[in-house]
Amino acid sequence: FLLSLYHTFPKLQGKRLWLAGESYAGKFIPYMADWIYKHEAENQRAGIHLHGINMIDGFFMDDIIGKELPSMQFAQQHYRSMNISEADMSALEAKAQKIGIADYVEKYLHYPPKGPLPVPRGLNKSESVYSAFKKLAKKANPCFSPFYVIATAPCPLNSMGQNVTSEKAFPHNYFNDMPSIKPIIHADNKTYLSCSRAKPFKIMKKLHTQFPIHTVLPGVIEKSNRTIIQHGKLDYIMLVNGTSLAIQNMTWAGAQGFQSKPNKTLLVDGETAGLYHSERKLSLVQVDRASHMIAAYKPKPAYKLLQFLLGQIEEEDLIKA
C-alpha cells in the first residue's frame, strides 16, 4: 500500500515520514515501522524516508502490564474524585492483596530498573482488580468513561459517533450524516465507524503476532531519529503507569528501561501540562488531566508534542512556555 501511495502521489517522495497513532495503533505502528526499515533499499528508491514514530496511549504491551499490575495504585489515586466509597475500596484492596498487586508499582517501578518485572503467582482473570474497579466506577457514576475517568453526565455521542461510556462506535457521525463529504474525497459510499467493531487483537493473536515491546519495538527505537510515547493520566483504557512499567521492562540501545525517573515539566502557555523524559532516542510524555484521546481533551499539549515529533521544536523547548 505504501509503495502504491508514493507512486500515485509523487510529491510525497523524498519528504520525511512519521508514523503516529493512538490506542490499537500501539501494536500496529512498530510493526509497520519495522517493515519499512527492513526494506530500506526498496523504500529509499520509492522516496520513502521514515524518521520515527509516535504512540498515544498505545497498546504496545499486554494487558497484564498495561492494566492489571498498576490498577490498584490507579484506584487509590482516583477513587475519591470518582465518588467510590471507602467500603468498596477496602474490598478492592483485599482483592489486590490476595493476588499480590496491592503495592506492585511501589515495589517494582524503579529508575533504573532492578531486572525483569515479575508476574505475581496469584494473578488471574477471575480476580481482576482492573475489572472490579471499573465496575465500582460505573456503579458510582453511570456516565463513567474508561477513556476519561472524571467524565460526568450527560454522556452523548461525540462528533465521531463514539459513545465513550460504552466503548462502542455508532454510525451517527459527521462522515455518514453529511452526504457531501464522501464524494469530495472519493470515499466509497458505505457506512464508516470511528473504531472497528471487530477485535483486531484477537485477529493478530490467531496470526501469533506478539506485542511489539517483546519483538520489534526496541529495534525501531534504535533505528528511528525519534520515538515518542504519550499517555494521558486520566485514561483507564490503558494506565499511565502500565506504560511506565512496560518501558522499564524493555531493553533497547544496550540498557533496560530509563536510567532516570521522568521529572521534567512540560509547559504549555506558561502552565504545567505534564512530565517528560528522554533517553536513547525514546521520549515518554505523561499529560496531566488528559484522556485516552489526548488531542481531543488537551489539544494544546498535543500540538506542542506534534511539533517536537516533527523536529519543529527541540526537547529543551518542551519546558519553555
Region locations from a protein language model:
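Terminal and linker regions of secretory-pathway proteins
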Residues: F1-A321
